[in-house]
Structures are given as structure tokens and as C-alpha cells.
Amino acid sequence: MSIVVQSAVTHFRPVMILAGGTGGHIFPGLAVAGALRARGVPVVWLGATGKMETHLVPKHGIEIQTIAVAGVRGRGMLALLGAPVRVLRAIFAAMGVLRRYRPRVVVSFGGFAAGPGGIAARFMRLPLIVHEQNRAPGMTNRVLARVAKRVLSGFPGSFVAEEVVGNPVRKDIAGLPAPGVRFSGRSGPVRLLVLGGSQGARVMNDALPVVLRVLSDSDVAVEVRHQCGEALCAETERAYAYAGVAARIEPFISDMAAAYAWADLVVCRAGASTLAELCAAGVGSVLIPFPAAVDDHQTRNAEYLVAAGAALLLQQDRALYVYLESVLRDLLSDPMRRLAMAEAARGLAKSDAAECIAEIVLEESI
């Protein structure tokens, strides 16, 4: 399947990006695609039929080719037994796409199509670059890293032989003033930003109103901005109303740079892209990793920020409410600690990641 936005006919061989399935794979790929196109390099995308990338990528003016491929984890024994045949078909389909476009280099950011696409690139002796966003690498990139020409990572410790380049973030977030400048002279209520992600995190929607109600007995005033996901807005509003806590409830925040600039502290999950944004913006955080994340990669991500003093880590378990109350009580009343965490986060930032990856791609082009 082909969704054509820009012509594949060009005087230059394109770079092919392999990424899909989740925004955590797609958005870093889009950032690097933008950096390459700014240099006049054409880009074509290989994704999986019917997945998120087929909707997102064309909106950025990038041509996408798709192959039929799906994951096998958690799909039962029949899916596992039939996997080799489906994988071989996907590899041959990917080889057909590669023959058509003859890319100068292939870059994997992970996802369903990345495995067959990367293996096909290896068979065809095309340069393969792998970028892993998480500290615990996904299955696809673990396989491809063994045959890739360059292995890049967003965090240290993903692979033994790696180049740590960071995860791409939007320029408006990377361009925010330093924490000391933003927080200087700030007065009024402490500004708490809660990010549940595009689908919403029900545990945060449930926990924050209850915890903030308990904290209302303190001397610290808190202003809350809570992004809860479209499907969970009504129940989140009811939870805050029942708790008697005033909050600005939003299904989606379009201007994340402004939200980070506003915040004194963030409570959120620990996806790689979110953590890269926290570091680029320079804001301290309380991280609650998604417990069902594959290979518990969000906990591994969070531990990196915690070790640097940029965040605190809470597990989603029965004691969450108790620990969240204790942590927020301390942080909301301690502006110097919040500033120290924000500065530690900023110290981890690699705000030029997209440009760095683009340069590496061009170095390896044939």
C-alpha cells in the first residue's frame, strides 16, 4: 500500500525511515525526517498497514509505503506458530519497497514494520542505522542492533556498543529559558502539571484529586492543570469536583512548550519522549511508570532521571496514594528543591538530537 504525498521521483536517493505502532517510535522519526528534509534530502517511510503511522506521517508531507505485519506478543500460540511465515512475507514485501526506492540509508526507530524492513536492508547490503528511544530496547531494535552499521540511543545503557545522541524534541520546547530564569520572581500558587498522555492515565485521574484534597490542609496553595485524555475527561472532572479541588482539566494540550514553561512540577508517566521533553524544558517531575509497558521500559527510563536528581519515581501499586501524598507535600513546599530538580533535568538535555541523528545518517549514506 502506498500513500503518496510527495513524488518519489527525485534526483537524489531518499533516506528510508522505519517507524510505527506508537507515537514513541513515530515522533522521533518525524523529527529526524524534518531535519533531513531541511537539508534537501528526500525521505520515504516504511510502516505497517492500518497502524498509527499511516495517519500521522502523510500529514507531514512524507510519502509512506506500508507492509502487512503485526506483533506476536500476547496473541497466543497460534499466532506464534504462524509468525515465521508472516515474517518472511513481510521481509519479501519490504525488499520490494527497498528495490523500488533504492534508499541511500535505512533508519529504524522501532515498531512493527522496522523488523522486516531492517532485515531486508541487511540482505540488500544497505546501510542500516538503529535508534532506540528507551533504556530497555524493544525486541525489534535488539535484533537489528546486531546487524546495524551504527547503533544510536536516547539514554545511556541501552546497548553495549552505542552512541548516545538523545531523543528528538520539538524546537519550541528546547528553546525555553533556563529554569533559573523561568522561576525567578515567580509568586502565587505552586503550578502542578499532570500529564496522563493522549489516552489518559486513569490512575492519575483517580489519585491526584484525592491526594490534593488531603494536601489542602497545608499552607501551600496549588494551581492544577491536568491533561487527562479525551475519553476520561468527564470522570476526571467529576473526581476533582467530588474532592473539592479546583483544576483546569484538558483532554489534550496542543502547546506543550507553554505548558512546561508554566509548570513548577510535573506528574507524568515515563515514556522516552516525555522524559526527553522534561529534560529539554528543564522541569522536575514525579514519575509513575506504566506498569504494563513492554519489558518495564518506563521504569528503566525513569531511573536515569532519578539517578541525576531530576525526578522522583513512584510505582503504581497499592501504596501509590500514600507515597504520592508524601512526595507532593515535600516538593510543593520546597521551591529550592524544585529548582534543583529542574536544573538537573536541564543538565541531561540533548536538545540537538534530531540534527545529530541527521548528520550521522548523511555520514553513512551511499
Swiss-Prot record:
It is a peripheral membrane protein. It is found in: Cell inner membrane. Its EC number is 2.4.1.227. It comes from Xylella fastidiosa (strain M12). Belongs to the glycosyltransferase 28 family. MurG subfamily. UDP-N-acetyl-alpha-D-glucosamine binds at T22, G23, G24, N134, R170, S198, I253, Q298. NCBIfam families: murG (TIGR01133). GO terms for molecular function: UDP-N-acetyl-D-glucosamine:N-acetylmuramoyl-L-alanyl-D-glutamyl-meso-2,6-diaminopimelyl-D-alanyl-D-alanine-diphosphoundecaprenol 4-beta-N-acetylglucosaminlytransferase activity; undecaprenyldiphospho-muramoylpentapeptide beta-N-acetylglucosaminyltransferase activity. Keywords: Cell cycle, Cell division, Cell inner membrane, Cell membrane, Cell shape, Cell wall biogenesis/degradation, Glycosyltransferase, Membrane, Peptidoglycan synthesis, Transferase. InterPro entries: GlcNAc_MurG (IPR006009), Glyco_trans_28_C (IPR007235), GlycoTrans_28_N (IPR004276). Cell wall formation. Catalyzes the transfer of a GlcNAc subunit on undecaprenyl-pyrophosphoryl-MurNAc-pentapeptide (lipid intermediate I) to form undecaprenyl-pyrophosphoryl-MurNAc-(pentapeptide)GlcNAc (lipid intermediate II). The keyword Nucleotidyltransferase does not apply. Pathway: Cell wall biogenesis; peptidoglycan biosynthesis. The lineage of its organism: Bacteria, Pseudomonadati, Pseudomonadota, Gammaproteobacteria, Lysobacterales. It is an enzyme of class 2 (transferase). It catalyses: di-trans,octa-cis-undecaprenyl diphospho-N-acetyl-alpha-D-muramoyl-L-alanyl-D-glutamyl-meso-2,6-diaminopimeloyl-D-alanyl-D-alanine + UDP-N-acetyl-alpha-D-glucosamine = di-trans,octa-cis-undecaprenyl diphospho-[N-acetyl-alpha-D-glucosaminyl-(1->4)]-N-acetyl-alpha-D-muramoyl-L-alanyl-D-glutamyl-meso-2,6-diaminopimeloyl-D-alanyl-D-alanine + UDP + H(+). PANTHER family: GLYCOSYLTRANSFERASE, UDP-N-ACETYLGLUCOSAMINE--N-ACETYLMURAMYL-(PENTAPEPTIDE) PYROPHOSPHORYL-UNDECAPRENOL N-ACETYLGLUCOSAMINE TRANSFERASE 1. One of its GO terms (cellular component) is plasma membrane. HAMAP family: MurG. One of its GO terms (biological process) is cell wall organization. It holds the Pfam family Glyco_transf_28. This is UDP-N-acetylglucosamine--N-acetylmuramyl-(pentapeptide) pyrophosphoryl-undecaprenol N-acetylglucosamine transferase. Its main location: membrane.
